[in-house]
Amino acid sequence: MKEYRVYLERARSRQQDFLYPLIFREYIYGLAYSHNFNRSIFVENGGYDNKYTLLNVKRLITRMYQQNHLIISANDSNKNPFLGYNKNFYSQIISEGFAIVVEIPFFLQLSSSLEEAEIIKSYKNVRSIHSVFPFLEDKFTYLNYVSDIRIPYPIHLEILVQILRYWVKDVPFFHLLRWFLYHFXNWNCFIPTKKSISTFSKSNPRLFLFLYNFYVCEYESIFLFLRNKSYHLRLKSFSVFFERNFFYAKREHLVEVFSKDFSYTLPFFKDPNIHYVRYQGKCILASKNVPFLMNKWKYYFIHLWQCFFDVWSQPRTININQLSEHSFQLLGYFSNVRLNRSVVRSQMLQNTFLIEIVSKKLDIIVPIIPLIRSLAKAKFCNVLGHPISKPVWADSSDFDIIXRFLRICRNLSHYYNGSSKKKSLYRIKYILRLSCIKTLACKHKSTVRAFLKRSGSEELLEEFFTEEEEILSLIFPRDSFTLHRFHRNRIWYLDILFSNDLVNDE
């Protein structure tokens, strides 16, 4: 992002902080395609395309403003016979420009804010994905109740555009963004459907992720602000909200609506034992307190979404469960707190009595059924978990095929080595190993047995099972590291930067 700062500062001197002129800068599209937007292990980075040039962008934006609205609608086919251009191609070009331009000022605001000690201190509880796993081990054994929350959607993008206007003051840019969303992303309907959101996310992934993450960030900032500053709303720290219209009005309405459901008024409260974790479109709210307070937080979320973001959310979408009786899914794991009961014989003078001791242990389990479903979707096995060949990769060399399977197996192995029981993980490794062998046999037009006997690839494929033990034997001393400990202990790898494609498939 350093080059973003250089280019934007150059544009600032000429255009006075306006984003609209950046749409016509060709280097914006060069920067957009110089980064790897898709982290999928199956998709290669295509690089910068010459079709995304400044001249084409100018022509397309001019054509957008000059087209006849009586002829074109959002439900037209991708190729309009009157204007003779492909709407999907047009949408992709402008979408990349929007995404990269909107990200620049927010990155600069974040980098400038982090230079101030007060801002850093206020965000000291913000952590990366690496801190989630130690948090589960250290904190969850002391908590009693957990609320499984799915962030509501679809949200109309008009609301997102209005929220963006509080942060960026550029009327022409948002006029163009709104026009684009309504006429080329099928957002003409009053209530967007999940199908339209899915189509928009696939055709414009970077812009969709930015808008969605911005919506989540906005909702979390308001939620944390209300939680931390509930008794002293008008503080200096409120300046981070800039000029958010009707914030106090909606906040008062939120309290008013909430107080009608109870015989007495209970204002916003602080719960020192509450913990909040979010990943993708799901969040976990855990607390040590009684279910009554968790139920309070449940309705706070619902009214916040309905009153501030105009998103309808049903109370049944938020479940409150006891940790010792129910498991919850987060980051591709099934987690629960198990109660271990043990009896200890105690003797005092001549009296002997039994004492029952209850201890809590966190169980983190690999979700074998969703993983097999994901592998079946990726054509590594069938729905029953039986390995099959992947003929799509048969055109590659043997080394590339084995390297691809090993990379997938290594990523899944690193991700799920924090589980308490690894039998399910070994089953996934077995599916990938046999699928790799069948793919190689299919390429050489032979059976699995004949291929292994002829090529002697059996030793090479043992890497699917021996790699983890060899690495850990180099890290830990021989006397302390045993295979039994490796099977039982949870090991979190710090190279987990993102969830794999085969994780959290629903």
UniProtKB/Swiss-Prot annotation:
Main location: plastid
Gene Ontology BP terms: mRNA processing; RNA splicing; tRNA processing
Organism encoding this protein: Trifolium willdenovii
Compartments reported by the entry: Plastid, Chloroplast
Name of the protein: Maturase K
Family: Belongs to the intron maturase 2 family. MatK subfamily.
Stored PANTHER family: MATURASE K
HAMAP family named in the record: MatK
A single MF term (Gene Ontology): RNA binding
Record keywords, A-Z: Chloroplast, mRNA processing, Plastid, RNA-binding, tRNA processing
